[in-house]
Amino acid sequence: MKIGIITPMAEEKITLIAALEDVTTKQHGGTEITSGRYKGHEVILTESGIGKVAAASATALMIDNFEPDLVVNTGSAGALDPDLKIGDEVIGTQVAYSDVDVTVFGYAYGQVPNKPLYYQADPTVVKDFEQLAPVKEGLIVSGDQFVQDTAKKRILIHFPEALVAEMEAAAVAQVAYQFGTPFIVLRGVSDLANGDSGVVFDDYVVEAGRASAKLLLSYLDSKA
């Protein structure tokens, strides 16, 4: 299997790179792409940078140049579901934008014109991950903001079922959708999307990234 991995931050890819063999790194249009192998799988990994544009650019570059069988977006997120706690892992079975509003033209809140409101993760891959660990799964929402109390309330008005919020997954999903490439999103909870989120995030972002990486490596182990 050839798997493409998009991580927003360096802290979120440490565990993944450490697990690879035959590692090489090259620049592609200003984006650093790391290639390696893990138990027979070809792994392509990039740190996209934070935000939707950065994530979309990195995803398009990866798919166009390397044609992975599966795109995985890993990293951290802020909890919207009150049952989640720091360190928990979430599988995004579907993702949506939390900051797109063209409702004046008859689209649903969060829907980009002429695109689906929800981008669906590959159901077969989701089922495979379900066998690995008892994690929460459901809707992940993305927007270009670090979510705290006020934004959290607004998001939950539009997406009351959302589990976590972050800044890249929907952009990764939209690009994968347009290329016809299967995808899945794995996010570790780094903060509770409240008034203390900024401080807590700095303390737990590495732990959250490590949780996502370990779950992904378990999936690759199961496919070896």
Residue ranges: model-predicted function:
Residues 146-195:
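A C-terminal functional module that forms or caps the active site or interfaces directly
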Residues 79-160:
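Mid-sequence, gly/pro-rich, charge-dense loop/helix-turn segments that line enzyme active sites
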Residues 61-65, 83, 174-182:
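Alpha-helix C-terminal capping segments
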Residues 67-69:
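Proline-aspartate-enriched helix->loop->beta-strand connector
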Residues 1-63:
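N-terminal short beta-loop-beta anion/metal-coordinating cradle
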Residues 44-48, 141, 186:
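Active-site-proximal beta-strand elements of phosphoester/diester hydrolases
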Residues 194-224:
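His/Asp/Glu-rich mid-to-C-terminal helical/loop segments that flank catalytic regions of hydrolases
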